[in-house]
């Protein structure tokens, strides 16, 4: 299962979600606008930008990395 960490004002987050939807890939969205625990977790992993996308335990990265991963 894919998990995507997002913020409402993030254009690349919307693009990543659209890409997953176009590929008919199910995902869970975690909004950093509302989940401080998730924000702390990503910070501890030194992830400073959104989106951050995971396929299970595998950290894919952001939108560009997701696009490459799916190609």
Question: PLM features: what roles do these ranges have?
Answer:
Residues 1-25:
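Local sequence-structure signature of Cys/Sec-based thiol-disulfide redox active-site neighborhoods
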Residues 11, 36-37, 61:
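Short alpha-helical
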Residues 15, 37, 65:
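Residue-level recognition of oxygen-bearing side chains
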Residues 27-29, 59:
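Conserved beta-strand scaffold positions in the cores of enzyme catalytic domains, especially
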Residues 31-47:
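Thioredoxin-like thiol-disulfide oxidoreductase module
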Residues 45-53, 63-64:
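Structural micro-motif
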Residues 55-71:
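Non-catalytic, surface beta->alpha helical segment in thiol-disulfide oxidoreductase systems
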């Amino acid at each position: 299962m894919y998990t995507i960490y997002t913020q409402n004002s993030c254009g690349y987050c919307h693009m990543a979600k659209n890409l997953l939807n176009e590929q008919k890939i199910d995902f869970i969205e975690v909004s950093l606008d509302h989940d401080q625990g998730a924000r702390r977790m990503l910070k501890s992993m030194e992830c400073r930008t959104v989106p951050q996308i995971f396929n299970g335990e595998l950290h894919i990265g952001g939108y560009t990395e997701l696009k490459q991963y799916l190609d």
